[in-house]
């Protein structure tokens, strides 16, 4: 796992419209409906608690997960420290530069404030 930035305090921040899908059944149904494969690089916007990130790590080659909330980011660092196919970034996705040198797919349980 690669990681970039801060740490976790534990409260949901409604100003950034956090919402979490925690049902493994729902997550696997969502992932199954995508065309993500073992060869894909995936960018996940707002991984939150990492439930979807886990499934994406199983399904794809590499996941770059961008989390704005420093608290959640800290938990993600701990949760994924033994994974070797994930990069965690503590940044606002809206201010993050998308990669130009590789193809990628985007997956997100999009925070309401972005839409």
Question: What are the functions of these language-model segments?
Answer:
Residues 1-115:
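Catalytic cores of RNA-modifying enzymes
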């Amino acid at each position: 796992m690669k990681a970039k930035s801060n740490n976790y305090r534990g409260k949901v921040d409604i100003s950034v419209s956090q919402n979490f899908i925690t049902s493994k059944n729902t997550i696997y149904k969502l992932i199954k409906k995508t065309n993500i494969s073992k060869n894909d690089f995936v960018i996940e916007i707002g991984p939150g608690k990492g439930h979807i990130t886990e499934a994406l790590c199983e399904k794809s080659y590499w996941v770059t997960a961008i989390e704005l909330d420093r608290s959640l980011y800290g938990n993600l660092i701990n949760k994924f420290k033994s994974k070797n196919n994930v990069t965690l970034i503590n940044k606002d996705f809206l201010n993050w530069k998308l990669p130009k040198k590789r193809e990628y797919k985007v997956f997100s349980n999009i925070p309401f404030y972005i839409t």
